[in-house]
Amino acid sequence: MFGKLSLNSIPYHDPIIMITCCVVILVFLVISIIITIAQKWQYLWNEWCCTVDHKKIAKMYIFLAFIMLFRGFADAIMMRMQQFLVSSYHGNGTGFLPPHHYDQIFTAHGVIMIFFVAMPLVIGLMNFVVPLQIGSRDVAFPFLNNLSLWLTIFSALLMNVSLGIGEFAQTGWLAYPPLSELQYSPGVGVDYWIWSLQISGIGTTLTAINFLVTIIKMRSSGMNWFKIPVFTWTSFCTNILIIASFPVLTVSLLLLTLDRYLGFHFFTNDFGGNMMMYVNLIWIWGHPEVYILILPVFGIFSEVVATFSSKELFGYTSLIWATIVITILSFIVWLHHFFTMGASANVNAFFGITTMIISIPTGVKIFNWLFTMYRGNVRINSIMLWTIGFLITFSIGGMAGVLLSLPVIDFSLHNSLFLVAHFHNVIIGGVVFGCFAGITYWFPKLFGFMLSEKWGKRAFWCWFFGFFCAFMPLYALGLMGMTRRLSQNINPQFHSMLTIAALGTILIFIGIVFQIIQIFVSIRDRNLNRDCSGDPWNGRTLEWSTTSPPPFYNFAVLPIVQFRDSFWESKKSFKSNKLPILYTSFHMPKNTKFGFLIGFFAFLLGFSAVWYIFWLFFISFFVIIYLLVIKSLDTNCDYIISIEEIKEIEKCINIKKMD
């Protein structure tokens, strides 16, 4: 009845896992008791679980990302400590993690940081900012937005269930065959990996469709393509990449599923299977994924640099074309991830050259931002510190990437810690720093008060120096010959560098602690740091023309755009920032429970597939189909906001401003 699932599926023998699970269960129980005492279950269900408001959905994406960041960073600390101990002359020769546990940790770390930290951060910021920047009241398909969120949350939950029930994959975050095939990974770890990513990937694809339609069809009157803010432009290109690449991931996972469940031979070593086909397919998705993460971050820095330099963005048109070129080129560089596969010299040369070429439009952006700051009235705060930190770290990571684009060098450095350092250089120095800058920048608009500058700067310096301590030694270790994913028998000569890397990880941890303190201090002092103007940074784009936080309908009157920086131009010409008092009634979407329910049954479907509980699998599948049909037949999905209601809400907002 329960397939492979039994009491033996719980790893009682592993104290680290059991203690972690007990702590998680205890925290969950404490939170549940607090919510019950406060009688907030109904509120959470109606206002958050069922919401279609893009601003609330954005908050939940960002909250999910930070929760998963703690899990992913805990994995990182354990890996660093394991390598530090094993490489020690006098330390524990085997460390504290057995190889099978270490392999699960580095696999989970990669999956969490890409799929459940970086992606939710980027999608959360897109969710909040894009509709406001284009002068829209919501996204094109509010229900899809809610559904995408819950598919992402429940896929993250499914992955975390593997911590206490069964195991996670021991294959690396991309699960290369034949190691991920049933013959070499007969446990449920790879199945957890497949179904978590499959559910999450479907949610991400739906998000991309939603935002493409939103940007194309719901822009303000007068906002043509070259009046769109850069962040929205980069989000547009990102969603094109998602639509083009994520179906490849879906198909790759489906083929691997058929191999494991039905005995097919797409990627096996026998019966005509070809594991290199999988490697090509996964990287046709995987390399655009890097640009899916970094392009919105480029948009964030474009907004930040222009605002805090008090200047129009230098080379707006060249920035847009550079973004488009990167979007196109990102699909013709994937083979540089496996120059050692055995392709011909001509094939390797082609992909090496395209990899070098893609650095050109990226370099254009760097110079655009530098020239924007040049002779500008630059205000240095924590947001600009994240930006300057990005310019330094990302440039180093980019140069390392160009070095790796040379096949002759890649043959020596492939699968070494040099590659790990490069990857973290661009993801942490680029994506993470950028998202922190964006969250700090738009935090007043999101919550109505500003974050503490003092703690924000402290957090930045810990992250900045911690990053260099943690990852610069890995470049040297890679050149010295240390390969990635080692947990045993590490050369003691590497110990000094691994010690510095471990200290850097601790510094980053202190930075995370400072960020937690920053949030608590900011909440405590929120009345002192409240944003009553709606424009705390003297911004340039439309999101700053509404209140902080915006009302649920964003704009009582939809703006009309005449300039590229329309709000900035209106302030320059001494026009009032208040919107005209000429209201009309409009439709707003109703909250819906269907997104949560479909996400929940998708979780059950994935869990039952992992454990071969086929009766539950088919029940979950048909319930999902039933819910989709019922929702598609529902015509009562919106309501009208009357002129009187708008006037009353705007009156209350104005009173709060004066208070």
UniProtKB/Swiss-Prot annotation:
Signal peptide: none annotated. Binds 1 copper B ion per subunit. It is found in: Cell membrane. Residues 1-14, 78-109, 170-192, 257-280, 340-350, 404-416, 481-499, 609 are extracellular. It is a multi-pass membrane protein. One of its GO terms (molecular function) is metal ion binding. Fe(II)-heme o binds at residues 291, 414, 422. CDD domains: Ubiquinol_Oxidase_I. The chain crosses the membrane at residues 15-35, 57-77, 110-130, 149-169, 193-213, 236-256, 281-301, 319-339, 351-371, 383-403, 417-437, 460-480, 500-520, 588-608, 610-630. Its EC number is 7.1.1.3. It holds the Pfam family COX1. It is an enzyme of class 7 (translocase). Its cofactor is Cu(2+); heme b; Fe(II)-heme o. Residues 36-56, 131-148, 214-235, 302-318, 372-382, 438-459, 521-587, 631-659 are cytoplasmic. A ubiquinone binds at residues 71, 75, 101. Cu(2+) binds at residues 287, 336-337. Cytochrome bo(3) ubiquinol oxidase is the terminal enzyme in the aerobic respiratory chain. Catalyzes the four-electron reduction of O2 to water, using a ubiquinol as a membrane soluble electron donor for molecular oxygen reduction. Has proton pump activity across the membrane in addition to electron transfer, pumping 2 protons/electron and generating a proton motive force. All the redox centers of this enzyme complex are located within the largest subunit, subunit I. Protons are probably pumped via D- and K- channels found in this subunit. Ubiquinol oxidase catalyzes the terminal step in the electron transport chain. Belongs to the heme-copper respiratory oxidase family. NCBIfam families: CyoB (TIGR02843). The cytochrome bo(3) ubiquinol oxidase complex is a heterooctamer of two A chains, two B chains, two C chains and two D chains. This is Cytochrome bo(3) ubiquinol oxidase subunit 1. It comes from Buchnera aphidicola subsp. Baizongia pistaciae (strain Bp). The gene is cyoB.
